[in-house]
C-alpha cells in the first residue's frame, strides 16, 4: 500500500511503500450495556439557501408534486431514513427569527431579510405550523431552537405556550384561531444557538445567567415535558462547557456541541469534488478528531455531573466546503462525494461509543445545505452518498452498542492526525440481531478482515456495500446513481469467525443470521 504519509511507527515524512496488514477484531456480543439513541441520527433544517424553500417546502400551489406544500419525493426519501428528530429553524437564523411572523394566513405574514445567509428575503411562509406538521408526517421529534440573541423571555415563553398548551390560555386560543385545535408535543427546546457567536457574541457567564432566566419561564403545559438544551461550545472551547456546568448544572437537560470537518474559517475551505488523496486522508483525520473533543468535554461534564444527568448533544456536525461554483453566495450549497460518506460513517462510529453521555447528533443539513442527505433542483431530486450511509446505518438506531476491538494499520497525516485504515461499529437490536458496519478508509488497498464473533450463533451474513470508482465520485442530476449501495457477498462465517474482504474505499453494513 503506497502512502505519502508517515505511519505512526516512523518519524520520516518521505514516501514509502508497505503491504496492507491483515485486520483482526473481536465483537463482545455479551458486553453491550448502552443503547445507541436513535436521536444520534438526527437532522437539522435551517432557513438557509434552498434547505426549506425548494428543498422541503414548495407550497400547496406548486407544480412540483407535493402534499400540503411538502415535496413528495423528499418526504418519502426522509421517511425511508426513519429520521428520529429534526432541529429548526436554525442555526444562526434562529436568533433572528420571531415566531409570530410565521403564523396566520401565509399571504399576510411579514417578510424579513435573512442577514446571516446571503441577505435573502424570507417570506415566513414556512413557520411553526408547517414545521410541526412536517414532523408529524415524518414521525419524528421536533427540536425547536429558540431566539435568545435578539428575542425576549416573553417571546420564547409564549411560543412554548402556543405550541404545547391545551388549556384556555391566550396562546392556545391564538393557535386554535390559526387552525390547530390540539396542542403539539414538543420535547426538545434549544435555549439559543451559538450564543458565543452569531447568537449574541456572549460570554459563557452571561449566557449561563440568561439560560437560568429563560428556563424558568419556558414551562411544561398539559403533560408536555420540555427537554431544555443549553447553547454549548464550538469544538475546542472547553472553558465554555466548564462555565455552563458550574453555573447551570442540571437546570439544563443537555448542553450542545458544534464540530465541523472544515479546513478553517478564513479563506478557501477547499472544493467538495476536486481533491487529492492527501486532502482525503486529512479530512478523515479531522472527522475522527471529534472523538478527542467529545472526550475532553465529557471529562469536564463528568467532574460536575458524575451521574451523567446532563447529556451532550452534537447538534451541528459534518463537512463544510466551498460553495459550488455558480451558486448563490451565502447559501452553502455543496456537492457530496464518497469522501463525505466516510465522514458520516466514521463520525457515527465515534458517536456510538459515547452513548452514555452523547444522546443526540444533528448533521448539517437535511437538504441542499452543507453535508446534506438530499439535493433538489426544480422538480428533480438526488440522494447523496451521505444519505446512503444514514440509510445503511439506520439498523443501529435504538440498538444496544456492542464493544468491538480492532487491530489495523494506522497512518499519520498533516496536523499530527492519525487515521486507522479500518473503522467498525456493531449493535444488537431488540430481537437479538447483530449488525456490523465496516469502513475501509484506505483509498487504494482492499482489507482482509477477520473478526471473532464470540458466542454468537451466526451461520452467515448478508449486507450492502457503498463504494465508487473514485473518491471524488458524486451523484448529480444528470447521473444520480454513481454512488449507490449494492449487495455485498464477500463475507464468510465459519466456527464463530467471520472473514470479510473489504474493497478499497468502501463502507459495508452486515446483518448476522
Located regions from the model:
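Non-catalytic accessory regions flanking glycosidase/transglycosidase catalytic cores in CAZymes
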Residues: 4, 19-254, 287-323, 327-513
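Bacterial N-terminal signal peptides
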Residues: 7-15
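Anion-binding catalytic surfaces of enzymes that hydrolyze or transfer phosphate/sulfate esters
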Residues: 250-252, 256-266
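Active-site His/acidic residue clusters
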Residues: 261-281, 327
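Gly/Pro-rich active-site loop or hairpin
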Residues: 284
Amino acid at each position: 500500500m503506497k502512502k505519502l504519509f508517515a505511519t505512526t511507527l516512523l518519524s520520516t515524512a518521505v514516501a514509502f511503500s508497505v503491504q496492507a496488514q491483515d485486520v483482526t477484531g473481536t465483537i463482545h456480543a455479551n458486553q453491550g450495556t448502552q443503547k445507541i439513541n436513535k436521536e444520534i441520527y438526527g437532522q437539522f433544517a435551517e432557513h438557509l439557501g434552498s434547505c426549506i424553500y425548494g428543498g422541503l417546502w414548495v407550497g400547496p400551489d406548486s407544480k412540483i408534486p407535493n402534499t400540503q406544500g411538502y415535496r413528495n419525493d423528499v418526504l418519502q426519501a426522509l421517511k425511508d431514513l426513519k429520521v428520529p428528530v429534526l432541529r429548526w429553524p436554525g442555526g444562526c437564523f434562529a436568533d433572528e427569527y420571531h415566531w409570530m411572523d410565521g403564523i396566520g394566513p401565509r399571504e399576510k405574514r411579514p417578510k424579513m431579510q435573512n442577514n446571516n445567509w446571503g441577505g435573502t428575503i424570507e417570506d415566513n411562509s414556512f413557520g411553526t405550523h408547517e414545521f410541526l406538521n412536517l414532523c408529524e408526517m415524518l414521525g419524528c421529534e421536533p427540536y425547536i431552537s429558540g431566539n435568545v440573541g435578539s428575542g425576549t423571555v416573553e417571546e420564547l415563553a409564549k411560543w412554548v405556550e402556543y405550541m404545547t398548551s391545551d388549556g384556555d390560555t391566550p396562546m392556545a386560543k391564538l393557535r386554535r384561531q390559526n387552525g390547530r385545535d390540539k396542542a403539539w408535543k414538543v420535547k426538545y427546546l434549544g435555549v439559543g444557538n451559538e450564543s458565543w457567536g452569531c447568537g449574541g457574541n456572549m460570554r459563557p457567564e452571561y449566557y449561563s445567567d440568561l439560560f437560568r432566566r429563560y428556563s424558568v419561564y419556558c414551562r411544561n403545559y398539559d403533560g408536555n415535558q420540555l427537554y431544555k438544551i443549553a447553547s454549548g461550545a464550538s469544538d475546542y472551547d472547553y472553558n465554555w462547557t466548564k462555565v455552563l456546568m458550574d453555573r447551570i448544572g442540571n437546570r439544563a437537560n443537555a448542553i450542545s456541541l458544534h464540530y465541523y470537518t472544515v479546513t478553517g474559517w478564513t479563506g478557501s475551505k477547499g472544493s467538495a469534488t476536486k481533491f487529492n488523496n492527501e486532502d482525503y486522508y486529512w479530512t478523515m483525520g479531522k472527522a475522527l478528531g471529534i472523538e478527542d473533543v467529545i472526550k475532553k468535554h465529557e471529562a469536564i461534564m463528568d467532574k460536575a455531573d458524575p451521574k451523567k444527568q446532563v447529556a451532550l448533544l452534537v447538534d451541528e456536525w459534518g463537512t463544510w466546503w466551498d460553495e459550488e461554483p455558480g451558486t448563490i453566495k451565502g447559501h452553502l450549497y455543496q456537492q457530496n462525494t464518497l469522501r463525505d460518506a466516510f465522514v458520516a460513517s466514521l463520525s457515527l462510529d465515534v458517536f456510538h461509543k459515547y452513548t452514555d453521555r452523547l444522546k443526540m447528533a444533528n448533521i448539517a443539513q437535511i437538504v441542499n445545505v452543507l453535508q446534506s442527505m438530499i439535493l433538489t433542483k426544480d422538480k428533480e431530486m438526488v440522494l447523496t452518498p451521505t444519505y446512503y450511509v444514514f440509510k445503511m446505518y439506520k439498523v443501529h438506531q435504538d440498538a444496544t452498542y456492542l464493544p468491538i476491538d480492532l487491530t489495523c494499520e494506522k497512518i499519520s497525516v498533516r496536523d499530527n492526525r492519525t487515521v486507522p485504515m479500518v473503522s467498525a461499529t456493531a449493535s444488537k437490536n431488540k430481537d437479538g440481531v447483530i449488525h456490523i458496519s465496516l469502513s475501509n478508509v484506505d483509498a487504494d488497498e482492499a482489507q482482509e478482515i477477520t473478526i471473532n464473533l464470540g458466542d454468537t450463533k451466526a451461520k452467515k451474513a448478508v449486507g450492502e456495500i457503498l463504494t465508487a470508482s473514485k473518491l471524488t465520485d458524486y451523484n448529480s442530476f444528470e447521473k444520480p446513481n454513481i454512488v449507490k449501495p449494492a449487495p455485498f457477498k464477500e463475507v464468510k462465517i465459519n466456527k464463530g469467525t467471520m472473514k470479510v474482504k473489504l474493497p478499497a474505499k468502501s463502507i459495508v453494513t452486515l446483518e448476522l443470521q
